Curated annotation (Swiss-Prot):
It comes from Rattus norvegicus. It is an enzyme of class 3 (hydrolase). Cytidine deaminase catalyzing the cytidine to uridine postranscriptional editing of a variety of mRNAs. Form complexes with cofactors that confer differential editing activity and selectivity. Responsible for the postranscriptional editing of a CAA codon for Gln to a UAA codon for stop in the apolipoprotein B mRNA. Also involved in CGA (Arg) to UGA (Stop) editing in the NF1 mRNA. May also play a role in the epigenetic regulation of gene expression by participating in DNA demethylation. The keyword Nucleus applies. Expressed in the liver as well as small intestine. Gene3D superfamilies: Cytidine Deaminase, domain 2. It comes from the Eukaryota. This is C->U-editing enzyme APOBEC-1. The keyword Transferase does not apply. It catalyses: a cytidine in mRNA + H2O + H(+) = a uridine in mRNA + NH4(+); cytidine(6666) in apoB mRNA + H2O + H(+) = uridine(6666) in apoB mRNA + NH4(+). One of its GO terms (biological process) is triglyceride metabolic process. The active site is at E63. The gene is Apobec1. Its EC number is 3.5.4.-, 3.5.4.36. Homodimer. Interacts with A1CF; form an mRNA editing complex. Interacts with RBM47; form an mRNA editing complex. Found in a complex with CELF2/CUGBP2 and A1CF. Interacts with HNRPAB. Interacts with SYNCRIP.
Length: 229
């Protein structure tokens, strides 16, 4: 990721920025809203050759919308070379993971990096397998940290000039919990994170249930980061 700053007027690579309040609620790991927001950039190589855009769910998931847009707006041959970075408020579901894998098989010279704010229905075996399949196909998947949030704020959000450094800082514990669960998915371990949403008041709670297999296979630094070892 190459950091760029400044108002929209000096960023011709971006067609639309989202508003600060949109970014805050879409990418807060504690928020369990149904809609998905995708911020993406395509690097075609060379100087000044980065496309940036934003997308939200329509009648299709944002991942499918992106693939259709990418393959139909202009002609792309199988030898197309580019690097794509996605910043997703939710991780891909199982069906979207399959669509992404098929897309990458048709365009073998496309590299995809995915940063996610939350794991979508992470206890569903289909979603877990889908993420593993993506990783097996060469996709890099990571949980968004403060560094990625700041990058997205500067490059995808319509912030006022005086608020360039004032992007939302989310609780580190929630980020670490999703990192923990993502490791469980990658290693083929049972889910250990359970997330509950209470309607009154509007708060999100979590519980952790570790089995012996988690202690045996999860990297110690991941357990230490969440205070579990």
């Amino acid at each position: 990721m190459s950091s760029e700053t400044g108002p929209v007027a000096v960023d011709p690579t971006l067609r639309r920025r989202i508003e600060p309040h949109e970014f805050e609620v879409f990418f807060d790991p504690r928020e369990l809203r149904k809609e998905t927001c995708l911020l993406y950039e395509i690097n075609w190589g060379g100087r000044h050759s980065i496309w940036r855009h934003t997308s939200q769910n329509t009648n299709k998931h944002v991942e499918v919308n992106f693939i259709e847009k990418f393959t139909t707006e202009r002609y792309f041959c199988p030898n197309t070379r580019c690097s794509i970075t996605w910043f997703l408020s939710w991780s891909p579901c199982g069906e979207c993971s399959r669509a992404i894998t098929e897309f990458l098989s048709r365009y073998p010279h496309v590299t995809l990096f995915i940063y996610i704010a939350r794991l979508y229905h992470h206890a569903d075996p289909r979603n877990r397998q889908g993420l593993r399949d993506l990783i097996s196909s060469g996709v890099t998947i990571q949980i968004m940290t403060e560094q990625e949030s700041g990058y997205c704020w500067r490059n995808f959000v319509n912030y006022s000039p005086s608020n360039e450094a004032h992007w939302p800082r989310y609780p580190h514990l929630w980020v670490r919990l999703y990192v923990l669960e993502l490791y469980c998915i990658i290693l083929g371990l049972p889910p250990c994170l359970n997330i509950l949403r209470r309607k009154q008041p509007q708060l999100t709670f979590f519980t952790i249930a570790l089995q012996s297999c988690h202690y045996q296979r999860l990297p110690p630094h991941i357990l230490w980061a969440t205070g579990l070892k």
